[in-house]
Amino acid sequence: MIKRYLQFVKPYKYRIFATIIVGIIKFGIPMLIPLLIKYAIDGVINNHALTTDEKVHHLTIAIGIALFIFVIVRPPIEFIRQYLAQWTSNKILYDIRKKLYNHLQALSARFYANNQVGQVISRVINDVEQTKDFILTGLMNIWLDCITIIIALSIMFFLDVKLTLAALFIFPFYILTVYVFFGRLRKLTRERSQALAEVQGFLHERVQGISVVKSFAIEDNEAKNFDKKNANFLTRALKHTRWNAYSFATINTVTDIGPIIVIGVGAYLAISGSITVGTLAAFVGYLELLFGPLRRLVASFTTLTQSFASMDRVFQLIDEDYDIKNGVGAQPIEIKQGRIDIYHVNFQYNDNEAPILKDINLSIEKGETVAFVGMSGGGKSTLINLIPRFYDVTSGQILIDGHNIKDFLTGSLRNQIGLVQQDNILFSDTVKENILLGRPTATDEEVVEVAKVANAHDFIMNLPQGYDTEVGERGVKLSGGQKQRLSIARIFLNNPPILILDEATSALDLESESIIQEALDVLSKDRTTLIVAHRLSTITHADKIVVIENGHIVETGTHRELIAKQGAYEHLYSIQNL
């Protein structure tokens, strides 16, 4: 896991190295203070060979040098170190999020059907951000603390070996304590992160569906459901907090014993004349430079457990396999005719579930309008979703212009199929930007032209800022009919040879339906058009009507032929016209 993460770090290794070098200088400067104290006591105050004026002169020079180092030299070093560390870590997170976003766009509809959007967002935002601590702490601060400890110990050994050995007495207990607590903390951190993601997933769903909550007046019930998720997170968080508190209390106790031992031994040596008072004072100063980093290392280990848990979750997402892959030798094939042939297609969402489609065979000619009808759950929309490869067939094959759709590059295939759905998604951007999704390189004139053809231009011009009006999240500021017209406009802009209308007008009032049906009639002209519809009155003009029941095609023909047949279609039509 760490090795994989380091692949993102590798392009910035020289900056990290520079950050560590600058950090060594930054942390090395405070180590002069204990030596300054020793010099002031032993070299000046207790130096009876110097006169008072000489003592003041020597002390003034020493303090002047110290002030120059701490006031003039250290601040820019501190700035450079902080800037380098933050720039590098944020750039690495930028690369990770970029990779994750591209990965998410490549994942199939099956992944999104099986995972809460809120949890996915939590991994991309929260978990990636949490891994920043691995860069700042694991790759920078830990090394700086270790180097600080080594430098401090070297100076302490130089000052007095016995006192240094006394300081090292607690090290074995320190290492044992860290070892005991670290593994447990990592497990608890992973559990806490998962619980937080569940809270975020629940919250995301309920906020998106707040109209349902309010319409059924189930606020109290949903508050209880949220409280269950929130309470589970609280339980996990408190377990983590309790264990974290145990570790800090134990390790701080161990590191507090060290200075007490050193002061006791040092005082005895000073009384006996083995060391000077200045040496003892310097040693006490170095104790904080020794045990301070040791305490920070414990905090670093705690931080790293959280970072590793988040790293696990990030790579779980990165390792999510693609259901829909470009086949070997896939090409950006141009669809020239738009003929579709479906041979012996079977489909099931999961291996342990019953088939949704069973031995589907169908041919659709160039420019033909074909409608798919039947009871809900029969498999109409599922069949439609197989053509742009939102899902792959379980068995059988689908051909377009004689080419297996798996021979197309996925992006090339989908770019040549226009899809208008019942609830089209608009992004929280301007009207113009939402239309440009059809072809981002289109000109303003082309945007206006397709809006006119889609019967959208007039209502757009009545909006506060016209084409520059923000539509809100999912187009919340627009009516259903207005959103549908914008979605049709972007299909016009893309101008695909194949068009799929999946319940495109079923949720609209009669006036909106009439306006949109007019636009759809223009849109479907000279294109192979597939329509999924519940309102049979909207598809009587179709060249072919396909009736699907329980995953089987049970009837095929024109409206007149099927009415005359008095079968499944005639039964559905009669029910709707009672």
UniProtKB/Swiss-Prot annotation:
Gene3D superfamilies: ABC transporter type 1, transmembrane domain (1.20.1560.10), P-loop containing nucleotide triphosphate hydrolases (3.40.50.300). PROSITE patterns: ABC_TM1F (PS50929), ABC_TRANSPORTER_1 (PS00211), ABC_TRANSPORTER_2 (PS50893). The keyword Transmembrane helix applies. Residues 16-306 form the ABC transmembrane type-1 domain. GO terms for molecular function: ABC-type oligopeptide transporter activity; ATP binding; ATP hydrolysis activity. Belongs to the ABC transporter superfamily. Homodimer. The ATP-binding domain (NBD) and the transmembrane domain (TMD) are fused. May be involved in multidrug export. Transmembrane domains (TMD) form a pore in the cell membrane and the ATP-binding domain (NBD) is responsible for energy generation. This is Putative multidrug export ATP-binding/permease protein SAB1799c. It comes from Staphylococcus aureus (strain bovine RF122 / ET3-1).
